[in-house]
Regions:
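Acidic, surface-exposed loops and disordered segments
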Residues: 1-237
Length: 237
């Protein structure tokens, strides 16, 4: 097995960090590697805001109370960004249409691909991190905190630092439950219940809910109002 695949298959989320900074050279290497991810038509429809000041991290923590944010050496906010596209398009046309859902998919996928590249690059240098999607639940407040202009929105953040904890690799769904030959295969309740048992065994005494219970918590409630409100304010919907 190649070193790259070994690294990818050993990924764990790291939420506790040592009080050590990430040298600028390492951070530049990590971010430039993230930039090399594939993107739709090479539009690169995302931006990254690097947060290193403790004051700013504390302010973000007040909105999104995840301890990893405060402890991180650097918090990277990945922003879906059509602001740059709007400026580029207006060099050639008087109209700019962000394309609603399609525009959101373009920017979200571009940001996600760059984010995964970024985290993998960080792990290759011995750092750890965790992706924090809860930033979307406070989209309006984050837009103000980070001065996000029209046609931009927070997609997720990555808390990075020198790991101060180690976890076993969390078991994923069996390959046959997510990879199908030629056509989609309907999910079965039995497969979900089997994975519930795998996850519960992995978590041991730390388990408070099953995997399917967390699905119910997420998708048994309406969408976060702040997400849509911010998208509308930024002229993306």
């Amino acid at each position: 097995m190649s070193e790259t695949i070994t690294l990818m298959k050993s990924h764990t989320s790291v939420r506790r960090f040592k009080e050590e900074a990430i040298p600028q050279e390492d951070l530049n290497t990590i971010l430039s590697a993230g930039q090399m991810a594939s993107s739709w038509k090479n539009f690169q429809s995302y931006s990254v805001i690097v947060v290193r000041s403790q004051e700013k991290k504390d302010a973000l923590y007040e909105l999104v109370p995840q301890e990893a944010i405060r402890q991180s050496a650097a918090f990277l906010l990945f922003v879906g960004d059509l602001n740059r596209a709007e400026k580029g398009a207006r060099l050639h046309t008087d109209t700019f249409q962000p394309q609603g859902v399609e525009g959101l998919l373009i920017t979200s996928v571009d940001a996600a691909l760059a984010g995964q590249n970024t985290l993998l690059a960080a792990e290759s240098l011995g750092y750890g991190g965790v992706i924090i999607g809860l930033v979307r639940y406070k989209s309006v407040e984050l837009a103000e905190l980070f001065k996000l202009p029209d046609y931009t929105y927070p997609v997720f953040g990555i808390a990075l630092g020198v790991p101060n904890q180690n976890h076993d690799v969390k078991p994923r769904l069996p390959l046959e439950n997510v990879v199908f030959e030629e056509e989609y295969q309907e999910q079965t309740t039995e497969a979900i219940e089997a994975y519930d048992r795998v996850q519960t065994e992995y978590a041991g005494a730390r388990a408070t809910t099953t995997w399917s219970q967390r699905l119910a918590e997420q998708f048994g409630q309406p969408e976060p109002s702040s997400t849509r409100e911010n998208l509308e304010q930024k002229n993306l919907l």
